[in-house]
Swiss-Prot record:
Disulfide bonds: none annotated. PANTHER family: FACT COMPLEX SUBUNIT SSRP1, HISTONE CHAPERONE RTT106. Histones H3 and H4 chaperone involved in the nucleosome formation and heterochromatin silencing. Required for the deposition of H3K56ac-carrying H3-H4 complex onto newly-replicated DNA. Plays a role in the transcriptional regulation of the cell-cycle dependent histone genes by creating a repressive structure at the core histone gene promoter. It is found in: Nucleus; Chromosome. This is Histone chaperone RTT106. Belongs to the RTT106 family. It comes from Ajellomyces capsulatus (strain NAm1 / WU24) (Darling's disease fungus). It comes from the Eukaryota.
Length: 483
């Protein structure tokens, strides 16, 4: 098909009050004439929305137009998408697909379920109606799902995201609340705080809403039937939304915290009977909460959210280790730009959480950069000054758990232990803790904290003394981990 066969009247009418967008549509048609019919269908649909469905639908269409062109106030531009430049500006199949996604977001589509009066925190702080719709594409016959938030007063779609553009969905308990609540966090493609948005590609914002712990009284099926009529007696907002979202997701599932992954030794501050799955931390001056999940590490709940997928984490190290707190440095690489390394520092983490975090790192085979040569000197200097932090020793406490994770120093210690076992057969282990306070090198403490934490049941550790002589003659006060 040639651009000469374009129905100019249809496109001109649909975009008569938006010349820049009309120009971009014509540019895209000229570059990819095979999508001419699709752009005409979109134009017809936009015209129908504006003229046939009333003021509210016209306003929703206007939001798409504002977002796509980058015009209007910043608050209005954020309503549907972020990084909107290039939503229809680019050329090729991507531009056509993005335009179709934007149109589908506000389309009068089949409603799967909805929940009234949900409290949203991101990208807007207000109560809205959550909807899950499914639209049949006329081009390929495919069914695309959309998760969107509708203003219950104006009936406008405020923002949303196609289900196919969701990278991760998390259901996390809200910390430090007297009543149990949960935050559902939608992490879109290129919205994890690490991956940059490719040029001329549509990007959606993360979405966060809060639900109470109780029966889903404001949830309804698409037909309007209350969800409670078909739900079991134990159904809650959490279980209902998790089930409905999982049923409509093809490439991911809702992820919740698990005690198998991480649980804080300190219970919830206002609910002593509930376990806490979060760790309080700071990123710069911004306070937030860390969650260690089966698919990655999440930091929220204030903008900007950051989600470190396990596959994107390069290294993890402990720095600024003090007697009561330590910092966690996460080095990550974006799949789109694997050569570019980004480093994130999460500070002021309580020492009591160190064993659980360290176990999480080891479990998932993440490189513990606190044992790396490049980090060792800085951390030892901190230890020498502070003289009493046990966090550094605990950071390396499990270094020998896996043969693949052992450094050359730990392997050397194992060999020395074997030799000492043969030479000291008459040695009586004695009571634990006899060697506390004895001089040992800071290098040896950094590599293996087993002796100083008295986990192995040994008394005076001759192996460590020998190893300390091999590594560094400089003594250091014995440290005790306070976790």
């Amino acid at each position: 098909m040639s651009p000469d066969t374009v129905n100019n009247a249809v496109i001109d009418k649909a975009f008569e009050d938006n010349a820049p967008l009309r120009k971009r549509v014509y540019s895209a048609i000229a570059s990819t004439p095979e999508y001419t019919s699709l752009f005409e269908d979109i134009a017809k649909y936009a015209t129908t929305l504006r003229s046939g469905l009333g003021r509210d639908a016209s306003s929703a269409c206007s939001q798409v137009r504002v977002a796509a062109t980058g015009e209007g106030p910043a608050a209005k531009k954020r309503k549907l998408i972020n990084g909107s430049e290039g939503a229809v500006a680019g050329t090729g199949a991507g531009s056509a697909n993005d335009a179709a996604l934007l149109a589908g977001l506000t389309a009068d589509a089949e409603l799967q379920f909805y929940v009234q009066d949900l409290s949203f925190a991101i990208p807007q702080r207000k109560k809205l109606r959550l909807e899950l719709t499914r639209l049949v594409s006329s081009a390929a016959g495919a069914r695309e799902g959309y998760l969107r938030a509708r203003n219950q007063a104006s009936n406008e779609v405020e923002f949303g995201i196609p289900m196919s553009r969701i990278q991760h969905i998390l259901c996390l308990p809200v910390p430090e609340k007297t009543q149990r609540q949960f935050n559902f966090c939608i992490i879109p493609e290129h919205g994890d705080g690490i991956s940059p948005v490719p040029d001329h590609q549509l990007a959606f914002e993360p979405i966060v809403w809060t639900i109470p712990d109780g029966p889903p009284r404001t949830a309804y099926l698409g037909s309007g039937t209350p969800a409670l009529e078909s739900a079991n007696l134990a159904e809650t907002y959490e279980s209902y939304l998790k089930r409905m979202l999982d049923d409509n997701l093809r490439h991911t599932k809702v992820i919740c915290p698990s005690e198998k992954e991480f649980v804080s030794p300190t219970p919830e501050a206002h609910r002593k009977g509930d376990k806490a799955y979060h760790v309080k931390a700071f990123r710069g001056s911004k306070e937030g909460f860390l969650f260690f999940l089966s698919t990655g590490i999440f930091f929220g709940f204030k903008k900007p959210l950051v989600f470190f997928a396990l596959e994107n984490i390069d290294t993890i190290s402990y720095t600024s280790v003090l007697q009561r707190t330590f910092n966690l440095n996460i080095t990550a690489r974006s799949p789109a730009k694997p050569d570019e390394v980004q480093e994130f520092e999460l500070s002021m983490i309580d020492q009591s959480n160190h064993p659980g975090i360290d176990a999480y790192i080891k479990k998932h085979g993440l490189q513990d950069a606190s044992l790396a040569e490049a980090r060792r000197a800085k951390r030892l200097n901190i230890n020498g000054v502070k003289g009493g932090d046990g966090g550094t020793d605990s950071a390396a406490n499990h270094a020998g758990e896996s043969e693949e994770e052992e450094s050359e120093l730990v392997k050397a210690q194992r060999e020395l232990e074997d030799r000492e076992d043969e030479e000291e057969e008459d040695y009586d282990p004695g009571s634990e803790g006899d060697s506390d306070g004895s001089g040992s090198s800071s290098e040896e403490e950094d590599q293996d904290g087993d002796g100083q934490e008295d986990y192995d049941g040994e008394g005076k550790d001759l192996v460590k003394e020998e190893l300390g002589k091999m590594i560094s003659p400089k003594p250091q006060y014995q440290q005790t981990y306070n976790g």
